[in-house]
Amino acid sequence: MSLLALFFAITLGLAAADPPKDRLTYSIEWRLIHAGEAVLEYGPSSASVKLESAGLVSTLYKVQDAYRVEFDAPFCATSSMMNSSEGSRRRETAVTFDRNRGRASLTEKDLIKNSVVSKTEAQIPNCVQEVAAALLRLRRTKVEVGQSTQIPMSDGRKFAQVKVDAQERERIKTPAGTFNTVRYEANLLNGVIYSRKGRAFIWLTDDERRVPVRILLRMNFPLGTVTLDLEKEEHP
């Protein structure tokens, strides 16, 4: 799965209430240049992410990704679909989370060759989190600074209990303003869920709204650091 999945693969806690209806727009920075834009939208039983590269990055390696997940309360994934256009690659990745069987089934297709690239299954618990609904649960659950939790997570290929740490309070600035936040680290890289080496962080506002205002991936060479900063928040 592409880097789009990593940006939103952070989750913890329990919450049964309907998620907020939000549209959050992020500016993406890579190696100190504007690399693109990501839009995250939430509904009562679904979430979607759209990512598009821009500027020099788009000239070198154009990216247009769209991801959607359906879920039951409390944010238990039922299905997801990723359509990715990255460089010369065109892929469609569908995952079904069967809560009765306790299995996640993934099918990845090459849309150019019209062929199946891979099919995998993973054993999962009755309620598991994936990549976009994950952020909803983080927003609805407060883990105090210095505390951590372990949560069940699957991308359709693997299942793991992912540890999430509430590290410290920070005041940060993004294009949307200046915010008092709590920084979290999700330990889902380095073979836990994703094989890439690195670290994943997220900053939520330190208030009842708990808006995700920054997401940062600190990866090994050659990718380096990718930062998503909140640019705009809407409630359509």
Predicted feature locations:
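Acidic, serine/threonine-rich low-complexity disordered tracts
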Residues: 17-101, 138-236
